[in-house]
Amino acid sequence: MTPHNEAKKGDIAKVVLMPGDPLRAKFIAETFLEDAVCFNTVRGMLGYTGLYNGKRVSVMGSGMGMPSMGIYSYELYHCYDVEAIIRIGTAGGIADGVELRDLVLAMGACTDSNFAHQYRLPGTFAPTASFELLEKAVQTAREKNLRYRVGNVVTSDIFYGDCENETAEWKKMGVLAVEMETAALYMTAARAGKQALSITTVSDLPLKGESTSSEERQKTFTQMMEVALTVASEAVDGYDK
């Protein structure tokens, strides 16, 4: 147990899906998992473990932003022996050709945060996905004939920014989308020697003023969920050996 998670050792699977919204975790458990059991309700950050395609998988909310993702992912890696975390969430598409409901598989994560300062590195760290998980996700998206993009995202500490041009500047660097958690997950995984992947669905196009509804974000972005669950169920075998 930790201050934020009432689960006991063994309650959580080796691979965990992490949506930002704990209600999305509940939806995934009730919709996709067999024999799902709730292992955490502390602070309303719901977590469940069940079976997907006969493989043991967990899903737990991360909350919004890098500090929250940093706390929950750190505890999962260090206190519960989790080997891989797959973030599933929403992002604002900013690159040309990225459309609403497209999947974005984050190969790397830029950030405006000083999250990496804690590591006292003598230079700049480039947070990246675990290639094995990314490769599985790309293969799954292709097999399902889904619209997806692979590339950089930018993880921002700021949702309501004071500078209107920042998103456009990231676009110039080929960044696909903006969100708020991936860089923290990738850095936490790297420091722990574990694996991580971020799969997001484009819920907004901030440079065009287009968006989806909050209800749709919670309950209908099932393509992302199914890709992540497939990757998780296939990855479990490698960690259970």
Please tell me what each predicted stretch does.
Residues 18, 25, 65-69, 126, ...:
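Generic structural signal for well-ordered, non-membrane alpha-helical segments
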Residues 34-41, 145-151, 236-241:
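Flexible, glycine/charged-enriched surface loops at secondary-structure junctions
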Residues 136-144, 188, 227-238:
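Generic non-transmembrane alpha-helical segments
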